[in-house]
Curated annotation (Swiss-Prot):
Segments of skewed composition (Basic residues): 496-510
Protein name: Cryptochrome DASH
Pfam families: DNA_photolyase, FAD_binding_7
Family membership noted in the UniProt record: Belongs to the DNA photolyase class-1 family.
Names of required cofactors: FAD; (6R)-5,10-methylene-5,6,7,8-tetrahydrofolate
Domain of life from the UniProt record: Eukaryota
Function of the protein: May have a photoreceptor function. Has weak cyclobutyl pyrimidine photolyase activity when expressed in E.coli and when tested in vitro.
Keywords, ordered alphabetically: Chromophore, FAD, Flavoprotein
Amino acid sequence: MCVPSRVIICLLRNDLRLHDNEVLHWAHRNADQIVPLYCFDPRHYVGTHYFNFPKTGPHRLKFLLESVRDLRITLKKKGSNLLLRRGKPEEVIEDLVKQLGNVSAVTLHEEATKEETDVESAVKQACTRLGIKYQTFWGSTLYHREDLPFRHISSLPDVYTQFRKAVETQGKVRPTFQMPDKLKPLPSGLEEGSVPSHEDFDQQDPLTDPRTAFPCSGGESQALQRLEHYFWETNLVASYKDTRNGLIGLDYSTKFAPWLALGCVSPRYIYEQIGKYEKERTANQSTYWVIFELLWRDYFRFVALKYGRRIFFLRGLQDKDIPWKRDPKLFDAWKEGRTGVPFVDANMRELAMTGFMSNRGRQNVASFLTKDLGIDWRMGAEWFEYLLVDYDVCSNYGNWLYSAGIGNDPRENRKFNMIKQGLDYDSGGDYIRLWVPELQQIKGGDAHTPWALSNASLAHANLSLGETYPYPIVMAPEWSRHINQKPAGSWEKSARRGKGPSHTPKQHKNRGIDFYFSRNKDV
């Protein structure tokens, strides 16, 4: 009598890798045939929750399609394949189970936030109806949630440093899962499904901007190549702490984040490679700092587990009642990179053109939107969700809560000074000139404050404020301390009157936002 093969369906989501993948590892050990499955869930390609921005923008979609394509190639080399379907996972799985007839289990990695856990609940319900096993694992963090040195997730500290010290002294990182040279095969007769195109999602395939700091492709293969390059071929990891606040080029930071977001590389694998590098090459503050940043990623994921949907609420984790604004003209100026503050504008244009922005840039543009403009932080968070190639729900919302002063920042009223930050991290103005071509003829650090230039300097730079480049839509009093003073106009004088919140420059206070972008104003 022929015994039917045991088939296990492996639903892959943000774990698009073969290495250190407990879902595939468990299925390989417990099935005769396995079905790796990725679903293009239509719920990922609609509008965001509050402001209806597209959920998945062209840069991340491109990276996702590349990652899916790469994983399929890798699985084929191992004697398997990746099934691709368009549809809700719970419905696709139910159809597959009925089609195959001998599925014994469905397995997947758990996520932390509501939309993802809702999918898990729906898949579990489908498995219950069908009478098959539902098996989940936790594999997205460096430290496993069951190994945290806290009695319950509700005891997670609300300050990162306390969390970090606890896990570093009391926690242990689990070893990675090793995969065999060959995987169990797929059942016969299954259509593999084609990799969709941008057009299938009513989008255009974005061109690669030659200025981008992230000219990389998606996929596990590319992630592992990047690690090999950054660690072993160039030793760049040994100077990471000194270069991580860079703005231009590929190698100022690890650039692991996009691959981590889709699970193309495992944080535990990075950790193992750091340990190997420290034994064979060198151990210093820079090698430790890579782990330090991975712990931030862990922390925001565990914060999401602790607080649930509150990470998306207007009042944040601290339940603060802040009178946020929803001024569409101010927000448009921010997102389009035409605030008149060059450091903000350069970063926002880089994001729009490439899907990437440095960590330093993200902190600054978030501070500017929330602290200088007073705009609802969720507008910024959802805009990042749309555009970032490395969008990770927990890190994105955790960082925005932090920047807005309603998250895990132990310091009250942290506010970035756009001029000081720009001069500290782009003292020569090279980053400004790269992304704000209107200012290319302004030399040195003066590119950060074009409104402070004399009329002669502006004319020499072929710059007409209010026409070829806008005046700042707000001014913060503290900026004046960092401006290379030229013959001062009333803008500088008003800014030097004292500390306080950012304000519309006094002589234009009542003119409205349209004034700053009109080509016909009489200054």
